[in-house]
Amino acid sequence: MKALFFSLLFLSFQAFGQPLFLVSDEEMLASNANKNFFYPKSAISPDAPKIELVSPKLDATISSPTQIQLKFLPKTPAITKPETFRILYGTFQIDITERLLKVATVTAQGINVPEARLPNGKHKLILNVQDSDGRVGSRLIEFEIK
């Protein structure tokens, strides 16, 4: 209940012109405290769309705000369905898609978030997108904001 309160409080700040953070400090800390990360048991189709991380570069120091740029690579002749894109955060796989869509441009080719705001610390994102043949591509991205 406390986490819900802070999430609602956090979202209410956004309505008054404050910067929108994709996740709260509380969500990040709770996710990092739980070491049991869920991995799907089903295999992803080899023909599912690929999700390529263009930016940020994970081998460099990342600060907030940072640009997040993804490229969707469907297997021809299928096309990516941008309306199926989902982004799940952390160990508890909190769906932050709606938060992201407030600050992102999403097309069939990919996603661009000019200034993604995340608290300092370690982050895990699960990205999912479906193609016109119903295949779901998935990608796990782990990084640290310093």
Task: Kindly give the residue locations of the regions a language model identified.
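N-terminal signal peptide c-region/cleavage motif recognized by signal peptidases
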Residues: S12-Q14
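Short, compositionally biased P/S/T/A/G/V-rich stretches that sit at domain boundaries
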Residues: Q18-T66, L73
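Solvent-exposed loop/turn segments flanking beta-strands in beta-repeat/beta-sandwich domains
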Residues: K75-I87
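Short beta-strand edge segments in extracellular beta-sheet folds
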Residues: E142-K146
